[in-house]
């Protein structure tokens, strides 16, 4: 789960990380009012979407008068902001962050991720923060310094100071940098985050260290114990199909292809997509119905897939272990009738009650294309999707 920058800064404040004063707003008039309340000669008008690269995309503007605040808020609010992370379709801006300006002397970068090899949280930092940090990672990786943190001790003072020194924080500002690094680590740990970034972390002209941006991703499997994080969820920023799928406990991710996939088990789902691509097809989605799929869940899965206007065929690939093939067959038949299925449907099922499931499909009267192996199923659905079946 992702959250907005201003929400990330609310979390950082709770953990003692210095951030600029700012106010989230949803209208142009509120943007001007927020700037008036903040005071000062300079404000930053920032688009709030769940994607990076906003500055390069025109979603961050520095205003030097209230008239400019109004002008920029009017430009950004409601725009379809395109960045390298949104894709060509962009993301609509529904809210802004109006923030006090800052005296930027130097832009740094700090980020935390989980390293699955060492099974530790890794703190990354660079002296080259700002809009081009991805380019720094690609072209000059030696400028990115890392520390794998022992979970028994947390980020120690000496480790924080060493990292801050390596990225150019002067000695006089080390206590501030230490507090920010340790605060970010604690925030990451205590909220069950999977990613946390401050980019840029700035040094000001008078030696202050401030988090000018904040990005958090959270482990969705841990949200049950973080209602305060769930409260930050913005459904407008999420794929509507994925939101709908989550209501029925379906693991669904939209993709760019034209072949719908309904599979039980994440591993089999990924193998199914790989096999489709092997035979020249393009999956339209990842969809894991899990081990406890009901007729209702299968029907809803079909409805969600069929909302994709690019869909030209569907492959159902089931291994009946916990999941019984006859239950899936019943769901497929009911779903096909409920949605008046008009695209080719290929079904491959193996395992518990396999023969019964196949018999039910064969006697359903529906034009279902049967397959015995995953390779055969993939070949048939690719052919069907291209009109060659």
Swiss-Prot record:
Catalysed reaction equations from the record? succinate + ATP + CoA = succinyl-CoA + ADP + phosphate; GTP + succinate + CoA = succinyl-CoA + GDP + phosphate
User: According to the record, how does the cofactor bind?
Assistant: Binds 1 Mg(2+) ion per subunit.
Pathway listed for it is: Carbohydrate metabolism; tricarboxylic acid cycle; succinate from succinyl-CoA (ligase route): step 1/1
Q: Which residues bind Mg(2+)?
A: 199, 213
According to the lineage, what is the superkingdom?
Bacteria
What GO MF terms are annotated? ATP binding; magnesium ion binding; succinate-CoA ligase (ADP-forming) activity; succinate-CoA ligase (GDP-forming) activity
Q: Please list the residues that bind substrate.
A: 264, 321-323
Binding positions (ATP): 46, 53-55, 99, 102, 107
Cite the ATP-grasp domain residue spans from the record. Answer: 9-244
- PROSITE patterns under this entry? ATP_GRASP, SUCCINYL_COA_LIG_3
Q: What does the record give as EC number? A: 6.2.1.5
PANTHER family noted in UniProt: SUCCINATE--COA LIGASE [GDP-FORMING] SUBUNIT BETA, MITOCHONDRIAL, SUCCINYL-COA SYNTHETASE BETA CHAIN
Q: How does it assemble?
A: Heterotetramer of two alpha and two beta subunits.
The name under which this protein is listed is Succinate--CoA ligase [ADP-forming] subunit beta
Q: Which organism is it from?
A: Paraburkholderia xenovorans (strain LB400)
